[in-house]
Amino acid sequence: MQDRFIRSITQLPTPLADALIPLLHQNFAGHIDAQQLAELVQSSQMTEAEVLLALLPIAAALAKPPISEFYVGAIAKGKSGDIYMGANLELPGEALFHSVHAEQSAISHAWLSGESQIVDMIVNASPCGHCRQFMNELVEGGQIKIHLPSQDSHLLSYYLPYAFGPKDLNVQSPLLVKHETEFALDSSDPMVIEALDHAGLSYAPYTQSYAAVVLETADGATYCGRYAENAAFNPSMLPMQMALSNLTRHNRDFGEIRRAVLVESSQGKISLVGATMDALHPVAAIELEHIVVDPV
């Protein structure tokens, strides 16, 4: 079991903890598939809702909040039945707008894993307005059920009435609908090709600034992040922040980053290169490789 879970596992009921420990191996990064979840429910003799709430301390252990020291965990349950953990991330010494919220982390985890819809969001603190707006961008976002400890469950529409969302800007295919944009690039570099593929899957209906970041560690492992825009603009999630959140969930340190690539469209209304460098340079003493590509 990873050291970061030693403290949080003691907060779980013993039967659930005993069933969960084998899953918390060195490669565990917060994903539990539907079959594994069913086995946890059976072994613990708890309801699924009780298990999901009980797992929040495990999700919170994925957090990296050096500024607030406030650990927030979130669990997104997909239509597939799989669950995806996420946690808040703050960049040390940097402006707060670089922060990743736990709900954003969990949703990006699900998105990168190929999930097509989120049906439940379990979180250990009430979602802030930023996260409510971010969730509203998703497929059937208003129908996502929000679960909080010691509170009744409610739909997102309860927390965000009279919501402004994609349809108000004539976007009919919201976040998590699979979007594929083709780009032209002649490269044999696997890391660049990976970034190109993820840029094609990014979500940028408001600026067409399709983009992705891939980070590589010294052992050759890669961690990606895609751009995810929002109808309210400010809650958009930048690809570098998503990639850093992804890396952190996998229990890797910023100091292990040896290479960073940003691929973005030449036809976007904005460029993400400045914001990407702003997030990278405080955590890794490397240069960003910036590649601009043309849509096919």
From Swiss-Prot:
Binding site for Zn(2+): H101, C128, C131
Known cofactor(s): Zn(2+)
EC number(s) from the headed UniProt entry: 3.5.4.5
Cofactor note: Binds 1 zinc ion.
Root EC class: hydrolase
InterPro entries the UniProt entry points to: APOBEC/CMP_deaminase_Zn-bd, CMP_dCMP_dom, Cyd/dCyd_deaminase_Zn-bd, Cyt/Deoxycyt_deaminase, Cytidine_deaminase-like, Cytidine_deaminase_bacteria
Molecular function per GO: cytidine deaminase activity; identical protein binding; zinc ion binding
Record-annotated active site: E103 (proton donor)
One Pfam family in the UniProt entry: dCMP_cyt_deam_2
Record key words, sorted: Hydrolase, Metal-binding, Zinc
Gene Ontology biological-process entries: cytidine deamination
Catalytic activity: cytidine + H2O + H(+) = uridine + NH4(+); 2'-deoxycytidine + H2O + H(+) = 2'-deoxyuridine + NH4(+)
UniProt GO cellular component terms: cytosol
Annotated positions binding substrate: N88, L89, E90
Annotated ranges, domain CMP/dCMP-type deaminase: 47-167, 186-296
Lineage top rank: taxon: Bacteria
Similarity field: Belongs to the cytidine and deoxycytidylate deaminase family.
Role: This enzyme scavenges exogenous and endogenous cytidine and 2'-deoxycytidine for UMP synthesis.
Subunit structure: Homodimer.
Classification via PANTHER family: CYTIDINE DEAMINASE
The name this protein goes by in its record: Cytidine deaminase
Protein species of origin: Shewanella sp. (strain MR-7)
